[in-house]
Amino acid sequence: MGHRGKRKPLPAEPIAAHIESFAHDGKGIAHVDGRVVFVDGALPGEDVTFVYTEIKRDYAAGRVVEIVTASPDRVPARCRHFALCGGCSLQYLSEDAQIALKEDLLLDQFRRIGKVEPAAQFPPLRGPHWGYRSRARLGARYVAKKGRELVGFREHASAKIVDMTDCPVLHPALGERIQAFAELIEGLSLRERLPQIEAAVGEERTALVFRVLEDPTAEDFARLARFGKDQGLDVYIQREGRDSVAPVYPETAHDLSYSLPEWEVTFRFGPLDFTQVNMAINRQMIDQVMQALDPQPEERVLDLFCGLGNFTLPLARRAGHVTGVEGGAEAVARAIRNAADNGIGNVEFHVADLSKPESCGSWAGREYHKVLLDPSRSGALEILQCVPNWKAGRIVYVSCNPSTLARDAGILVHEYGYRLLKAGVMDMFPHTAHVESIAVFER
């Protein structure tokens, strides 16, 4: 019988290495014994010792044991939970160096994947590095060995929940209440049947949706309602899918909201609706998109992956007509209500699966002066086949994944004759390697 499936034990002794550069996820890259090693916790230019966490034929992974020679960009991590928590990965890197890393990653992806280069770069959009995150999914677990409830993010590469008391990157309405959330759940009968909390902060209200795997008791409901009242929070429970979300306190559900005063728009949204997590950057991002697209009163604009209208409604304040398209019917219904609430009539919205252009409606065959794309991480590959129909002179692409942006940029440039005029990063997620970016194409 063979020994297939048996793994050699990883070397236990720390190994010396010089860190040469960054990987796309913010890990340091070194070469040891002819193999690329991705070292978690290491910065370019540093001499470190590390231990292996994984060894494959072509590459390996490891984590830092000791920083022998530190980078001048290294700073002390502010959060006491940083070493364990998977919510952040770059707190030990200075703020300026984080921005530079993201700019380098974006340009590298353009060159390697899209074989394109922007003619110019936008200055990076920057905002608060702490207390910025207004939406989060927090894990919850009662740990019998500890005799208490844990609430927070997962540990690095683990399903375990970090034993945390606070979180400095979360909005204070959430980050300063982590311990209070844990104490609340600890007192519920279903504490072992409550795996997560969806939390969302609006300008006037903060909402918590407790995911429960069994129905709460009358005493549980009373505790949840009392907590909501005492803390000034909207409290919901979710037994199954989104349709099962029900208010506990207040007894009637209330929308959350955020406003864009410059564009005279206020958005209302539910606690499970998708919104950008960083409202300061969101406002700057909208301003930058408006400047880049420069919609005119006589122009028709197409806004794809429009969500609840985050870009659509500001665009409609300047353009002649805006068509918004989104895959989720609930988001489109919300966008229609937001347009009506803001007295905006020069818009239309459609529900369409943008990964299946053949099923899209008549809007996909129309001509538009300008187009905005804001897809998910998978990018806009499929819908790009409709680009010739639109005959747009300018396309602005907002991306949360530089690799799919680079792929799609290559298509726009090499297949459809656009020029990549300008690109830049937006620091939507400080202290992480997540890169939010914008690119402007013209022909």
Swiss-Prot record:
Residue ranges of every copy of the TRAM domain listed in the record: 8-66
Binding residues for [4Fe-4S] cluster: C79, C85, C88, C167
GO terms under biological process: rRNA base methylation
GO MF annotations in UniProt: 4 iron, 4 sulfur cluster binding; iron ion binding; RNA binding; rRNA (uridine-C5-)-methyltransferase activity
Coiled-coil features, chain-numbered ranges: none
UniProt keywords, alphabetically: 4Fe-4S, Iron, Iron-sulfur, Metal-binding, Methyltransferase, rRNA processing, S-adenosyl-L-methionine, Transferase
Catalysed reaction equations from the record: uridine(1939) in 23S rRNA + S-adenosyl-L-methionine = 5-methyluridine(1939) in 23S rRNA + S-adenosyl-L-homocysteine + H(+)
Protein purpose: Catalyzes the formation of 5-methyl-uridine at position 1939 (m5U1939) in 23S rRNA.
Similarity annotation: Belongs to the class I-like SAM-binding methyltransferase superfamily. RNA M5U methyltransferase family. RlmD subfamily.
Protein name: 23S rRNA (uracil(1939)-C(5))-methyltransferase RlmD
Source organism: Methylococcus capsulatus (strain ATCC 33009 / NCIMB 11132 / Bath)
Top-level taxonomy: Bacteria, Pseudomonadati, Pseudomonadota, Gammaproteobacteria, Methylococcales
Name of the encoding gene: rlmD
